[in-house]
UniProtKB/Swiss-Prot annotation:
The lineage of its organism: Eukaryota, Metazoa, Ecdysozoa, Arthropoda, Hexapoda. It comes from Anopheles gambiae. Belongs to the type-B carboxylesterase/lipase family. Residues 1-38 form the signal peptide. Pfam families: COesterase. Glycans are attached at residues 220, 670. It catalyses: acetylcholine + H2O = choline + acetate + H(+). This is Acetylcholinesterase. GO terms for molecular function: acetylcholinesterase activity. The active site is at residues 360, 486, 600. CDD domains: Esterase_lipase. The gene is Ace. One of its GO terms (cellular component) is plasma membrane.
Amino acid sequence: MEIRGLLMGRLRLGRRMVPLGLLGVTALLLILPPFALVQGRHHELNNGAAIGSHQLSAAAGVGLASQSAQSGSLASGVMSSVPAAGASSSSSSSLLSSSAEDDVARITLSKDADAFFTPYIGHGESVRIIDAELGTLEHVHSGATPRRRGLTRRESNSDANDNDPLVVNTDKGRIRGITVDAPSGKKVDVWLGIPYAQPPVGPLRFRHPRPAEKWTGVLNTTTPPNSCVQIVDTVFGDFPGATMWNPNTPLSEDCLYINVVAPRPRPKNAAVMLWIFGGGFYSGTATLDVYDHRALASEENVIVVSLQYRVASLGFLFLGTPEAPGNAGLFDQNLALRWVRDNIHRFGGDPSRVTLFGESAGAVSVSLHLLSALSRDLFQRAILQSGSPTAPWALVSREEATLRALRLAEAVGCPHEPSKLSDAVECLRGKDPHVLVNNEWGTLGICEFPFVPVVDGAFLDETPQRSLASGRFKKTEILTGSNTEEGYYFIIYYLTELLRKEEGVTVTREEFLQAVRELNPYVNGAARQAIVFEYTDWTEPDNPNSNRDALDKMVGDYHFTCNVNEFAQRYAEEGNNVYMYLYTHRSKGNPWPRWTGVMHGDEINYVFGEPLNPTLGYTEDEKDFSRKIMRYWSNFAKTGNPNPNTASSEFPEWPKHTAHGRHYLELGLNTSFVGRGPRLRQCAFWKKYLPQLVAATSNLPGPAPPSEPCESSAFFYRPDLIVLLVSLLTATVRFIQ
């Protein structure tokens, strides 16, 4: 029995309960976008207007696109990806004037408007800045699916000044950006929605990307790009802790674009930080407010780049054929890396100093570029936040990937016989993309996530475990770590009756044991008792807070912390410089209940400097803390070492994480603790002991009747539990040594 099949549970998708596992929390990692602590920001519709106003200035202080309200409807029992109408600020009516003309309305920005508009586009509508200098927008009623209408609509009618620093001559053509204010008032130059690939539509759906075609004239890259087609989280309604991760630009297959933000004055040969968003390979977009690049670029004098890549079946469907080769989303990222290599010097960046950084599935993506021979030479360093290629949710086998693709084909009425793969692909290409993403979960069995990376023989030649064991990966510096409560967010989504989204939630001992039973229905008694034994606080086994927190640790250790540790350990064993952190700060304005602690993704807004935005209510200490995090991250990108040239109380020394010392730095508001691990014993349990136990007890009967591990003297005479204890002690000693 494989370990990934141990912990099973139920997942709530909208109103539908789907069987799911704890070790199969895998599914949740991929349904839900990564999450972080920010304050939700929603704009209300103004007189039904379809234009969303958004100021890239200190006054508005939001990200690359407005955080507009989105809604979805349930289709076939899953969350719909159809966005709702757009939103605008309450003052937009005084800034805009419009005149309707059949299909096109010309909307002109008033000369006295102190705003940069990055429009939200409602379903069936699109808005584009035609000329940044004139401040003119074009509102196009574009039919059922919001999409870019091609490059010509974004070309300027006037010749560009060759001396204009906002006009950059890329290898595909000239582009024009715009200068905006960072939250601190510093200026940055921004280019949004630079095409790096041809739209992957029609016959290009599911295939590896093709480089963008050249264009003539000047392309106005001043509008945030489309988000790739995906489902939208509606489980908690308009709760900002969840909706902050929903896409805030139109959903479209035409989504392969890059964003670049550079400090002003423009640097020469600056370090480049390329962000890869998370979302479980199922969702996500580079334009979220929490990823606002302006503070990081302006405060640390680095070039910040982000990219859109295909997710869900459109990005990771695999049939092993030229038409559906798999890993299209990873090849999107690879093509974007090549674009950065060939063009970033034109923006003031140094192509030899590119650092990839990402969180959750973004961190897994970064790690796969470290492993892939196709990507290793395209960047220098890597930062991995709460993600590792050895996570149980990171990859599936070729056989399983093919089975899931055929299940999807069957669900949408396409040929699904293994002998008719070409027919299946041809049919799937003709389906509406929203139909595909809305039917992916209906094709699955228990505890499975539909479309993730696969060992395809092209991007990946072997499993990450084999690459790490053999030393076949990029030898370089890495910075990596995890947060103290990695599991709570996912547990809240599938144990909704037990862990309600409110203050004061506790878990009794009986509820804890019941939760473990629900999460582990298919394992034998020894394995289940081992998990209960390991995650019980035996000094206070009936403590309701400890029992609640133990559930978080079970999920977080298995899916995140222990895999991050494993990756760091293997890198350190090869003599690479490794820096590890444990993130411990919970923001004052966190919308989630306090008992959720420091959840998966809570570090992201501090990495991007969101607390520096004066409109968001962060404390002065949190602003200073964000400056410290940005400095650590950017120092690493510049030099391979997060430490400043001279140590100080403000920047405590961050020790290397060596194979023997295993040191990490605790990143908290007022702490500078250096620890060892983290969570060495628990990771020995998952990585060393439990696999041995499962192998040793595989012939034992199924799940034993639920009970406390030590509730009677009979415990000491059970052979399976004697094996359990001996194996646990042996594995723990070996792991720590």
